[in-house]
Every structure is written in structure tokens, then in C-alpha cells.
């Protein structure tokens, strides 16, 4: 959804046995991003990481957030990325101890010119 000074959105899905990109967020023209990742599953844990790219079509990456685990039962993590030169970030998810349903919510604030 487009906001006056930025955007917001949500994405949900189910993890698998291999890492998949659940959501890609582009940073131009945004300066600040808040991401909530929630494990919406009552029986399985969820693992995630946030991978940053310097270039939109780049192949070199760095783990902005190394692999973390969210316990079953609506465990939620908050990630704040501010004033970064990243082109984009991928939020990647994988099974913890079984397929887990997840929800990702985010907001991005525009650069003020």
C-alpha cells in the first residue's frame, strides 16, 4: 500500500525444507525500513535470515541478519534497517522442525529531498 511518505505491506506463506526468498524489499528511494517476521505456526519453528545486496542485479551479498529461529506460537522478530546504501534485501525462510506458516509485515519511509 502506498503511504504519503512511504509504503507498507504484508506477505504470508509456508516454509519449506530449503531456503526460499519470502520477500524482496528494494531500498531506493527509501531510507528506513521496519520488518516484523512472525511464526504463525502452533507446532513448528521457523528459521529466517535477511540477505543484503549492494546492487540490484548484484551477486555479492552479506547476511544483514544471520540465521535466527522463531519458536512456534506467534514468536515475532523486529528488524530495523536505517540509512543504508543497500539496493535491496531478501527475507529468506526455511523450516525449523517442520513446515511453518509465517507472516511478514513491513513499512518503508521515503527519503526527504
Please state what every model-predicted region is.
Residues 3, 16-23, 53-67:
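Tryptophan-centered short beta-strand motifs
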Residues 32-46:
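Generic amphipathic, hydrophobic interface segment in small proteins and small subunits
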Residues 38, 53-55, 94:
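A generic structural motif
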Residues 1-19, 24-26, 40-42, 93-113:
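C-terminal interaction-tip segments
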Residues 31-35, 81-103:
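Noncatalytic modules at the cell exterior or secretory-pathway interfaces
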Residues 43-59, 105:
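Short, surface-exposed beta-strand/strand-loop-strand elements in extracellular ectodomains
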Residues 7-13, 62-73:
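Solvent-exposed serine/threonine-rich low-complexity stretches and specific carbohydrate-binding patches
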Residues 21-25, 74-82:
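Exposed aromatic-hydrophobic patches
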Amino acid at each position: 500500500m502506498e503511504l504519503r511518505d512511504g509504503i507498507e505491506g504484508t506477505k504470508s506463506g509456508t516454509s519449506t525444507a530449503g531456503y526460499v526468498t519470502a520477500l524482496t524489499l528494494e531500498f531506493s528511494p527509501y531510507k528506513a525500513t521496519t520488518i516484523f517476521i512472525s511464526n504463525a505456526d502452533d507446532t513448528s519453528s521457523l528459521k529466517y535470515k535477511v540477505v543484503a545486496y549492494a546492487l540490484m542485479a548484484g551477486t555479492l551479498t552479506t547476511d544483514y541478519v544471520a540465521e535466527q529461529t522463531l519458536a512456534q506460537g506467534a514468536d515475532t522478530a523486529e528488524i530495523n534497517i536505517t540509512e543504508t546504501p543497500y539496493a535491496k534485501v531478501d527475507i529468506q525462510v526455511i523450516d525449523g522442525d517442520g513446515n511453518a506458516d509465517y507472516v511478514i509485515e513491513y513499512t518503508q519511509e521515503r527519503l526527504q529531498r
